[in-house]
Design a protein with these regions (language model features):
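Class I S-adenosyl-L-methionine
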Residues: 1-88, 93, 189
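A contiguous loop/helix-start segment that scaffolds small-molecule binding in enzyme catalytic cores
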Residues: 2, 39, 49-54, 110, ...
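Short hydrophobic/aromatic-enriched beta-strand-loop microsegments
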Residues: 3, 21-28, 81-83, 102-109, ...
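Short secondary-structure boundary/capping segments
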Residues: 14-15, 46, 103-104, 131-132, ...
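Acidic/glycine-enriched edge-of-secondary-structure segments
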Residues: 22-36, 107-117, 141
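Class I SAM-dependent methyltransferase SAM-binding "motif I" and its flanking Rossmann-like core
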Residues: 59-136, 179-182, 186
């Protein structure tokens, strides 16, 4: 009956929705939120309690930085039964689509997925342990980190990460608007600026 979709959901999927279904946009982009998260949570509960069949369409996996946990918690507390259809996380699917392996037996035997925009700073100080992250030999994947790229880069180098470490910045992966910039930890901020990649 209703599809509540977000910014990262593929528009081609919306073309498959029944003609009589209601489409509600609940997207978030950087600091521009069409609906605040609590409003999305309340909307999902309201629609379900009205007896409507509701699809919450998200890009990637809803439980990996997708706020699916928050939405599911709200539905559970309201007594609403729901089903999760796991998605394929952009943390590994987008690099693969771009030809960048996140693991390789000669270079990286692990990968680590990290938020690129923390919502839980303590007095303006990052709660991420950049000292530990800088020592990791595996691939570091920062999701939604473009706006904070200069801070991420500086924090890693200040804590000992080799400035020659290869870096890729991937934007809107697997879509017609996909952008890829590659460089090193030392120059990736300049490369991204030169390529005109912005949030």
């Amino acid at each position: 009956d209703v599809v509540v979709y977000d910014n990262l959901a593929s528009s081609s999927l919306l073309n498959e929705v029944r003609d009589d279904a209601e489409l509600i946009y609940a997207g978030k982009r950087s600091s521009n939120h069409h609906l605040k998260q609590y409003e999305t949570n309340e909307l999902l509960v309201k629609l379900a309690l009205e007896g409507k069949n509701v699809v919450r369409l998200k890009g990637g996996d809803p439980y990996i930085f997708g706020r699916g946990g928050e939405e599911g918690q709200e539905l559970r507390e309201a007594g609403v039964d729901f089903e999760i259809v796991p998605g394929i996380s952009s943390s590994y699917s987008v690099p693969a689509y771009c030809g960048i392996p996140v693991t390789h037996r000669d270079f990286a035997s692990s990968f680590h997925v990290i938020t690129g925009h923390e919502g839980n700073h303590k007095n303006g100080v990052s709660v991420l342990n950049y000292e530990t992250l800088a020592k990791e030999e595996g691939t570091l994947i920062f999701l939604m980190g473009l706006k904070n790229l200069p801070n991420i880069v500086a924090s890693l180098m200040e804590n000992g990460k080799d400035p020659a470490t290869p870096v890729g910045v991937l934007q809107e992966g697997t879509t017609a608007r996909q952008r890829v910039a590659t460089g090193t930890l030392a120059d990736i901020v300049e490369v991204v600026e030169r390529e005109g990649i912005k949030t």
